[in-house]
Amino acid sequence: MAKGSLNLQDLFLNQLRKEKVNVTIFLLSGFQLKGVIKGFDNFTLIVETDNNKQQLIYKHAISSIMPSKPINYMAQAQNNQQASQQSNNNQG
């Protein structure tokens, strides 16, 4: 992916992680997990459940993620874009 382009999945997951939003994760098998996203990478999520247990979930097993409240993931995208523009201005 080109530098400066937006990755919606990462913006969304990072905002959920930073705000510690409770989520319901629906797996392809029909199973549901409820908890807070503690971290993620290209292939996995780490979710902490209500009983303080952590689970590593592979993204290919996820159908959808439903936050308990609306997420403003575009605010982070705009902040990233502004920081990138300032960095470019300082270099030139």
From Swiss-Prot:
Keywords of this entry: RNA-binding, Stress response
Q: Which family does it belong to?
A: Belongs to the Hfq family.
State the protein's name. Answer: RNA-binding protein Hfq
CDD domains of this UniProt entry? Hfq (cd01716)
Where is each Sm domain found?
10-71
Q: Name one GO molecular function term.
A: RNA binding
Q: Please indicate which superkingdom the organism of origin belongs to.
A: Bacteria
Q: InterPro entries recorded for this chain?
A: Hfq, LSM_dom_sf, Sm
* Ranges of compositional bias, category Low complexity: 75-92
Q: How does it assemble?
A: Homohexamer.
Q: One short Pfam family name for this protein?
A: Hfq
User: Listed GO cellular component terms?
Assistant: cytosol
In residue numbers, the region (Disordered) covers 73-92
| Task performed by this protein | RNA chaperone that binds small regulatory RNA (sRNAs) and mRNAs to facilitate mRNA translational regulation in response to envelope stress, environmental stress and changes in metabolite concentrations. Also binds with high specificity to tRNAs.
Q: Name one GO biological process term.
A: regulation of translation, ncRNA-mediated
